[in-house]
């Protein structure tokens, strides 16, 4: 049996303010804190949406790394990126998102943070470039890389300069046809390189563009970097000496929709040679049997090595991520590090030429670990951070790290840590700064473990405003997507458990079979078990809550989930557990087994169900929420959300479910966004999403009556289409 890990403040009343949807969506959103070379200050961006003006404002701030004080650097909304330039503690290169000469282009400006408004233009770029990485060479010149969309001929794509075609037709001879939320074209993402020439003069040196941009990706047919939809600047790196660029691309020589295989390419910064993969099928150092996805290439400080991660399985997107270190120019087999460790890394950086720092998901958190660059496969890395989820980390001159993280109780937390001392000092945290998050703290979260179907399962517990253990609160059962994913101790603007809890629930968020960060065995066991082991874990979790927590009212409980969590809600609707809930919410869940073939990343379904749709159809139908015998059990009121741009799980899945619920006479509602994908990101749409989801749950759980401030379905001003007689 598990035990709830009580925190000292959790059982007492607090003066915390309820976190409501408007506060969540309109609270400031901040980027990682990027330190200057001396480690005195760091810069970060901040954006904030207003429901009064219906606009987003943005700014850049400076964080003092000694005092924690924050001051405004600029509120110019056209400044989209800032990077420190050279070893100077105050000179920065920034991206101006507009271009005075080229519509749709951007400009590079150089400025001093002590007089930011009086910088100068160093370069005019012909398209919308982003993800800048910069090094200063021995000559003083600046070399950089960035990415943009590219035409097939290698020139950068500029949407504002393109003539609209006369026909809207699209023609395909291979897959993908569409991916995530867009239809493929002949364009692709590419990494470009450029140089800023240093000129000495009176006062500070100045920099100006030198030569043309070089497309480093287009010479390799079918290569693309960063790889959409989630690729970004972590997909490539520039060596500290400015001579080399490493980038990730999906394998260019096999069907991209059927395999996860990716290569790390190496190319001179000047593009004088065509990029070659260091881990491709013909590369001399490729480890035997390693054919899966790869990523996060990063050069060592001496530019002689590249660290990266790679999976072995070419059809499993959540396979174990093993760390590798390649020596530039070597033909020896690329060695793996800590390959036997039962955790997958998310990110990697070099501490020095002999040691690395890796970010790793671990037991509901994302932590930092240190590891020697020559570690054997049996090495167990050492953790030096604890709670929350690390989103960025930068080494300071004293070998400590400036860490940016989030937690369930804060959207932004900046602190200093080191492998030797752990967390040393907290500099800033959003719940102490933002009125919208006032009163939030680690006391709002607990966790417990319970016996699942075959192993112990972890679950988070999130308490409502002014929680009182002597009272009773309806259960909100939270089911995550993936399925190889997990609920983390992290902030979310889409599925924030505290917003749900503050309506008047105790949120329980289990990490059942299939969840990541608890070892490969738990994660991998979901294969061909979508409605099996995880469902049984959830049943046992509900039973454990029902038997052990008097302050949780399971009689009036509700459940919600998205993506795989949406599938599970659909599965629960036709299962005995479905009768334990007063209402259900299914967001973008798969419903009809035979419709799985309409997804885009075919490797996913083929791995999850042990074969293709035509060779092993029974496995696809084994866990079919739309099976007739399951439909006959549907009775719990259900809200279905599905959007038109969701090409991962097409909108027809949600419509099919809604049709059946309506014909069966089950209270149901369909919420659709024509301009959203698998996620709801537009701020106004997000508000409607929260109003409808919370309003639906509150209506059937009784929270609407017990909490006068609870969200109601009537809060949404969008008219409801209803042709019932």
From Swiss-Prot:
List of catalytic residues: 563, 646, 678
S-S bridge residues: none
Glycosylation sites: 75, 96, 153, 258, 383, 453, 610
SUPFAM superfamilies: alpha/beta-Hydrolases, DPP6 N-terminal domain-like
InterPro entries per UniProt: 6-blade_b-propeller_TolB-like, AB_hydrolase_fold, PD40, Peptidase_S9_cat
Known function: Extracellular dipeptidyl-peptidase which removes N-terminal dipeptides sequentially from polypeptides having unsubstituted N-termini.
Protein name per its UniProtKB record: Probable dipeptidyl-peptidase 5
The organism of origin for this protein: Aspergillus flavus (strain ATCC 200026 / FGSC A1120 / IAM 13836 / NRRL 3357 / JCM 12722 / SRRC 167)
């Amino acid at each position: 049996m598990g035990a709830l890990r009580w925190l000292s403040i959790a059982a007492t009343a607090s003066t915390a303010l309820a976190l409501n949807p408007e506060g969540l969506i309109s609270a400031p959103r901040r980027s990682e804190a990027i330190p200057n070379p001396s480690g005195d200050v760091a810069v970060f961006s901040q954006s904030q949406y207003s429901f009064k003006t219906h606009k987003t404002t943005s700014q850049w701030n400076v964080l003092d790394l000694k005092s924690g004080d924050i001051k405004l650097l600029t509120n110019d909304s056209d400044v989209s990126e800032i990077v420190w330039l050279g070893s100077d503690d105050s000179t920065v290169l920034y991206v101006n998102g507009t271009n005075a000469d080229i519509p749709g282009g951007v400009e590079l400006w150089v400025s001093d943070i002590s007089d930011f408004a009086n910088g100068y233009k160093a370069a005019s770029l012909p398209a919308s470039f982003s993800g800048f990485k910069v090094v200063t060479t021995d000559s003083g010149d600046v070399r950089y890389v960035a990415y943009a969309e590219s035409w097939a001929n290698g020139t950068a794509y500029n949407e504002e300069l393109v003539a609209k075609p006369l026909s809207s037709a699209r023609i395909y001879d291979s897959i993908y046809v569409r991916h995530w939320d867009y239809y493929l074209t002949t364009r692709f993402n590419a990494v470009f390189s450029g140089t800023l020439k240093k000129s000495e003069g009176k006062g500070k040196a100045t920099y100006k563009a030198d030569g043309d941009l070089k497309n480093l990706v287009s010479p390799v047919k079918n290569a693309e970097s960063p790889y959409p939809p989630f690729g970004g600047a972590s997909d490539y790196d520039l060596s500290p000496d400015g001579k080399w660029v490493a980038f990730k691309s999906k394998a260019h020589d096999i069907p991209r929709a059927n395999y996860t295989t990716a290569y790390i390419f190496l190319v001179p910064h000047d593009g004088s040679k065509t990029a070659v993969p260091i881990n491709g099928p013909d590369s001399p150092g490729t480890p035997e049997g390693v054919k899966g996805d790869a990523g996060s290439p990063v050069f060592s400080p001496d530019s002689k090595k590249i660290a990266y991660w790679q999976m072995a399985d070419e059809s499993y997107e959540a396979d174990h991520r093993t760390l590798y270190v390649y020596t530039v120019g070597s033909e020896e087999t690329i060695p793996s590090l800590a390959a036997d460790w039962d955790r997958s890394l998310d990110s990697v950086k070099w501490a020095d030429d002999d040691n690395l720092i890796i970010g790793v998901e671990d037991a509901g958190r994302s932590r930092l670990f240190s590891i020697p660059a020559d570690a054997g496969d049996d090495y167990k890395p050492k953790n030096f951070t604890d709670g929350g989820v690390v989103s960025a980390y930068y080494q300071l001159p004293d070998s400590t790290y400036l860490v940016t993280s989030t937690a369930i109780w804060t959207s932004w937390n900046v602190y200093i840590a080191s492998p030797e001392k752990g967390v040393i000092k907290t500099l800033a945290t959003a719940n102490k700064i933002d009125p919208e998050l006032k009163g939030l703290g680690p006391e709002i979260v607990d966790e417990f473990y319970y016996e699942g179907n075959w192993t112990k399962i972890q679950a988070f517990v999130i308490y409502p405003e002014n929680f009182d253990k002597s009272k009773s609160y309806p259960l909100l059962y939270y089911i995550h997507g993936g399925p190889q994913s997990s609920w983390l101790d992290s902030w979310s603007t889409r599925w924030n458990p505290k917003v749900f809890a503050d309506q008047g629930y105790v949120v329980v968020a289990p990490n059942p079979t299939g969840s990541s960060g608890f070892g490969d065995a738990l994660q991998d066991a979901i294969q061909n078990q979508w409605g099996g082991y995880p469902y049984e874990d959830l049943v046992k979790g509900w039973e454990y809550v029902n038997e052990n927590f008097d302050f949780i009212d399971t009689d009036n409980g509700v459940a919600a989930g998205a993506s795989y969590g949406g599938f599970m809600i659909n599965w629960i609707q036709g299962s005995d557990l479905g009768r334990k809930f007063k209402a259900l919410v299914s967001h973008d869940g798969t419903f009809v087994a035979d419709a799985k073939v309409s997804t885009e990343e075919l490797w996913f379904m083929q791995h999850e169900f042990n074969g293709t749709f035509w060779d092993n159809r029974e496995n696809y139908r084994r866990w079919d929420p739309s099976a007739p015998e399951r439909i006959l059990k549907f009775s719990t009121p259900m809200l279905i959300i599905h959007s038109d741009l969701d090409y991962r799980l097409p909108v027809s899945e949600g419509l099919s479910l809604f049709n059946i619920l309506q014909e069966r006479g089950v209270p149901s509602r369909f919420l659709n966004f024509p301009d959203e994908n698998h996620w709801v990101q537009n701020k106004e749409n997000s508000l409607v999403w929260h109003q409808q989801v919370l309003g639906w749950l509150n209506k059937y759980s009784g929270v609407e009556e017990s909490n006068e401030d609870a969200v109601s379905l009537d809060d949404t001003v969008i008219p409801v289409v209803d042709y019932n007689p």
